[in-house]
Amino acid sequence: MNVKRLVTASAALAVTLSALTYGVAADTSTVGSEKVKHVLLLSIDGMHAVDFYNCAHGIAGANDGNPYCPNLAKLASTGINYVAASSSKPSDSAPGLMALVTGGSPKSTGIYYDVAFDRTLDGPETTTGTGLAAAPCTPFAIPTGTTTDNDQGIDIDDTKLNGGAPGHALTDGTAASIDPKKLSRNPAAGCAPVYPWNFIRTNTIFGVIHAAGGYTAWIDKHPSYAMVAGPGGTGLDDYYAPEVDSNVVALPGIKTSQGVSCATVRDATVSSWNASFEDIQCYDALRVDALLKEIAGKRHTGSQAVTPAIMGMNFQAVYTGESVSEPGVGNGGYQNAAALPSAELLQEIESVDISIGDIVNALKDKGIYDDTLIIITAKHGGSPIDPTRYVADGTNTPATLLGTRIPYSESPLNSTGIGATEDDVSVLWLNKGESVPSAVEILEQNATAIGLGQIYYGPTLALNYGVGGWQPGQDPRTPDIIVTPNVGVTYSGSTTMIADHGGFAHDDTNVMLLVSHPCLSPQTVFAETATTQVAPTIVKALGLNPSALTAVKAEGTPVLAEVWSQLSR
């Protein structure tokens, strides 16, 4: 192998990791329009459109029927509310986030799930933390195809909040937390590891804004979600992602939005942030603290920088509140099909709302509220809202039925493997040479057992995702089959979940989408809208060309017309 090329590649990687970890202060003066100099993007993961409606208007049975998200409601008084907004399909966090920051669907981005499959790659050098086994890779040989792991499994140490990043503070998770030996490898590039930011096929809002001279920052839940930087990895100036699937630890100096100290672990009976209604509030508070620093013109570590032109984060608390059953505490979720929140979900919505109030106050303290466009949405929803519809079926799943017909790395027959791409959806890639119609026939014959709702394959899948396969001209990432089950059926088989996401159902995809700015008049849009429209709207609001986004150009994704109409008055 060419040594010079390896040295050059290593140097480029070092620059990428340095940029994603420490950032390089930039002058934002070249980015912005008359009314918008900054954009704040917030994803309240799991927040349905109806959740926002209920909390802003009140619903009998919660908070004495009074509204319980005053800060969100206040933003709506100078905002445009899109009540028929749809997230990505599949509605997993990874494609959901990519929709927001690229303007594209999985057809363009190549991101179907955080754990998916690529027919042109080979497996990692060492087994990932989530069980994707090490596999051979021969440089420039024909690939065998592999499951691709872009979640906590590629952390150096996913039990640690900092992801195991060497030399980093215990709470400082960044792209430096990624273990290159756990990454899928590309035989066509000499078996080089494929970093998350190079796994995505399109550029992102961060790359476009950074290239135009804007300072960029993002906060999320996995180091792997540094993929939002886009190809090359240089689109982000500051990235912060303490590992959400790490062990729960005390957070000295951090208080929840309601003022409760996180200096000691609030709920020591669980080991995961996502498993506790209380601990997840501390996890979110840690990241809100970082966002407040960025608004003040600092990096997430507190060192000096500038206020980003584009910044934001995701919140985890609402999704935990709507999907978790915590032993000894109670069930989250909803009390009925009208989306009346449980006491646990109610407290998570209230917690996030207070945090948003703190963030808005920080913008005002910095003197930039009047020229900041605030977009609040969700990567995904969660299904079912109606608690009587939930069916956890981890035995009769499409992947189980197909068994040896799917790659061993994905198969439930592999007891130590990472598992199939199944939540309240089943995304299936078949082994090379397997018959898709034969596999579909097996699924159809067992429709009742698997709670089959709809099968997408052939033209019904290719229409929106392209033609997948192993042959030249076929998309190596497009699945062969997607199964959406009946409403409420989930294939994870979890005993601690009462809802899930990833599917195409209304509850999975109808998410909150509110765009707020002091110059906007309140407006409700009932027409169908897609979260992919957020990306071109952000770029245009900052005075840049939305067509600079490759997915927007490829798919013809429009801006949110109502936002632009009011901003341009």
Where are these regions (language model features)?
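Short, structured active-site-proximal loop/turn typified by the sulfatase FGly-forming signature C/S-X-P-X-R
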Residues: 52-110, 215-217
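Bacterial N-terminal signal peptides
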Residues: 10-19
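Active-site His/acidic residue clusters
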Residues: 222-223, 227-238, 299-351, 388-390
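Active-site neighborhoods of enzymes that stabilize oxyanions during catalysis
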Residues: 172-185, 198-203, 413-537, 541
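Catalytic-site neighborhoods of secreted/periplasmic enzymes
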Residues: 143-188, 193-259, 549
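Metal-dependent active-site segment of extracytoplasmic phospho-/sulfohydrolases and closely related
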Residues: 350-393, 464, 538
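Short, solvent-exposed turn/loop segments enriched in Gly/Ser/Thr/Pro and often Arg
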Residues: 81-101, 219-229, 316, 552-559
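Acidic/histidine-rich catalytic neighborhood
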Residues: 371, 375-433
